[in-house]
């Protein structure tokens, strides 16, 4: 919320600080940039590419907000703790935490290894749990925690997608219970559950979502995916970012403990 020249401007986040995990590219980058455009100062978290993260920082600064990039592997709890400590050390406080880091996985039940199970759940589930824990410990009163689920967690069943879907189903439960645990600090906890969203990862895995998907080009698969929604268009990172921006705002306060499907009605 913001007051400019004595006038209240709905939806603005001026004076707020947001930590967005996994925001060097894709949906996370779109969220970080959008929150920056709404006036928040942003901590861009990344695990691998400092160059990609710096591009996001530059976009946010170009929009008039401050931003820094902090490298931290969300699979490592000590690095999550350091991420939030450094965010507070730099900006003085944190008001919004968007838990976006994740990996995708496909495999028939008979073929899934222990190593693959641990790879997926260590980030999608365990990582998000401890991001939320550190967010609660560091967030100012009245803050926002926004987690990332998927429409495959319950409404959209995809063969050979059990690890990913299950890892996100746990997040749905986290959101519901965390909203109770965080009430003493007036922190709301919600989740977004994207459907197929056009990013580089989408093009890498879209053949898994479409029967005989290997027969089609990436462009053809994207066109086919658009018809999963009655709106007959694809979802894009900005579609997710717009909802996250609302949940982070004062106007989103009465939404709490909810996971919002963002799939254009595909499910």
UniProtKB/Swiss-Prot annotation:
UniProt entry keywords in alphabetical sequence: NADP, Oxidoreductase
Enzyme class: oxidoreductase
The protein's annotated pathway: Pigment biosynthesis
Entry's induction text: Expression is positively regulated by the transcriptional regulator wor1. Expression is down-regulated during biotrophic growth within tomato leaves. The expression is induced at later stages of infection when conidiophores emerge from the plant and produce conidia.
Positions annotated to bind NADP(+): 27, 73, 100, 133, 164, 168, 199
Molecular function (Gene Ontology), one example: oxidoreductase activity, acting on CH-OH group of donors
Source organism (scientific name): Passalora fulva (Tomato leaf mold)
Function of the protein: Non-reducing polyketide synthase; part of the gene cluster that mediates the biosynthesis of the bianthraquinone cladofulvin, a conidial pigment not required for virulence but that plays a role in fitness and resistance to environmental stresses including UV light and low-temperature stress. The pathway begins with the synthesis of atrochrysone thioester by the polyketide synthase (PKS) claG. The atrochrysone carboxyl ACP thioesterase claF then breaks the thioester bond and releases the atrochrysone carboxylic acid from claG.
Cross-referenced Pfam families: adh_short_C2
Family to which this protein belongs: Belongs to the short-chain dehydrogenases/reductases (SDR) family.
InterPro entries per record: NAD(P)-bd_dom_sf, Sc_DH/Rdtase_CS, SDR_fam
Catalytic residues (UniProt): 149 (proton donor), 150 (proton donor), 164 (proton acceptor), 168 (lowers pka of active site tyr)
Name under which the protein is recorded: Short chain dehydrogenase claC
Keyword DNA-binding on entry: no
Protein's UniProt keywords contain rRNA-binding: no
Enzyme Commission code(s) on record: 1.1.1.-
Entry superkingdom: Eukaryota
């Amino acid at each position: 919320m913001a007051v400019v020249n004595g006038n209240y401007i709905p939806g603005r986040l001026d004076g707020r600080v947001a930590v967005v995990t996994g925001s060097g590219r894709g949906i996370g980058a779109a969220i970080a940039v959008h929150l920056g455009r709404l006036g928040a100062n942003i901590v861009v978290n990344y695990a691998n590419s400092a160059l990609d993260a710096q591009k996001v920082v530059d976009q946010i600064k170009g929009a008039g907000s401050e931003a820094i990039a902090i490298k931290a592997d969300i699979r490592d709890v000590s690095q999550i703790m350091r991420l939030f400590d450094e965010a507070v050390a730099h900006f003085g406080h944190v008001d919004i935490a968007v838990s976006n880091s994740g990996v995708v996985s496909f495999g028939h039940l008979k073929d899934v290894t222990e190593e693959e199970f641990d790879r997926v759940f260590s980030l999608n589930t365990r990582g998000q749990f401890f991001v939320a824990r550190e967010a609660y410990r560091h967030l100012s009163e009245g803050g926002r925690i926004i987690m990332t689920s998927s429409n495959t967690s319950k409404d959209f069943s995809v063969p050979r997608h059990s690890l990913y879907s299950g890892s996100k189903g746990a997040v749905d439960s986290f959101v519901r219970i965390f909203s109770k645990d965080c009430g003493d600090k007036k922190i709301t906890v919600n989740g977004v559950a994207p459907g197929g969203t056009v990013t580089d990862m989408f093009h890498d895995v879209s053949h898994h979502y479409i029967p005989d998907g290997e027969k089609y080009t990436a462009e053809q698969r994207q066109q086919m995916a658009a018809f999963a929604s009655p709106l007959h268009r694809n979802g894009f990172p900005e579609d997710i970012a717009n909802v996250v921006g609302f949940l982070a705002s004062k106007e989103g306060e009465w939404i709490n403990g909810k996971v919002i499907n963002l799939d254009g009605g595909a499910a």
